[in-house]
């Protein structure tokens, strides 16, 4: 929750972003994705934690009760770009569990498009698994990240929010271990 607050503050007060999402925004993949890399040699998958910049954003649309956009994305760590569908509803989600619930709902809505496959659950699942919407990238803004997501990364500047509320760690020792890791 606090990461979302920081990301919104950075976007609106420092970067002067006015739209919900814009070209130039930096996003972090929040769930591994193998679908969009199939047509790119040498790119096995988009990993949870990969940070990408939006080079182009178009065709924002609502479908199945959710919002999607076509995006051209550029890796900040490697020399490649990729075209994919981004699932806009996941950008402001507070937890992976919430995204999992949204994914289940999306599955059910897509299944309604294929009543002829209702008798063959296997064929229905195979069809849905090939949907660009079911495979849309789940992402979050990447201006502020959690301590967990930052592990293994290299950063020029680090600001640690040492909030010592119930959500952070249990007990004083847990807090200091977390702070050491950060």
Regions found by a protein language model. Name each.
Residues 2-181:
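Core RecA-like ATPase module of SF1/SF2 helicases and allied nucleic-acid translocases
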């Amino acid at each position: 929750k606090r990461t979302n607050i920081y990301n919104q503050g950075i976007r609106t007060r420092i970067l002067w972003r006015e739209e919900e999402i814009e070209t130039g925004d930096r996003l972090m993949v929040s769930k591994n994705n193998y679908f969009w890399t199939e047509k790119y040699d040498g790119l096995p998958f988009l990993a949870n934690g990969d940070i990408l910049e939006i080079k182009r954003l178009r065709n924002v649309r609502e479908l199945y009760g959710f919002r999607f956009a076509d995006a051209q994305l550029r890796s900040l760590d490697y020399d490649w770009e990729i075209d994919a569908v981004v699932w806009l509803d996941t950008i402001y989600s507070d937890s992976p569990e919430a995204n999992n619930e949204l994914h289940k709902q999306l599955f059910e809505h897509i299944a309604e498009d294929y009543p002829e496959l209702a008798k063959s659950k296997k064929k229905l699942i195979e069809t849905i698994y090939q949907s660009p919407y079911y495979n849309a990238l789940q992402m979050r803004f990447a201006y502020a990240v959690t301590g967990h997501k930052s592990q293994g990364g290299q950063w020029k500047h680090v600001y640690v929010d040492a909030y010592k509320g119930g959500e952070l760690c249990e007990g004083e020792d847990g807090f200091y271990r977390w702070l050491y890791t950060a």
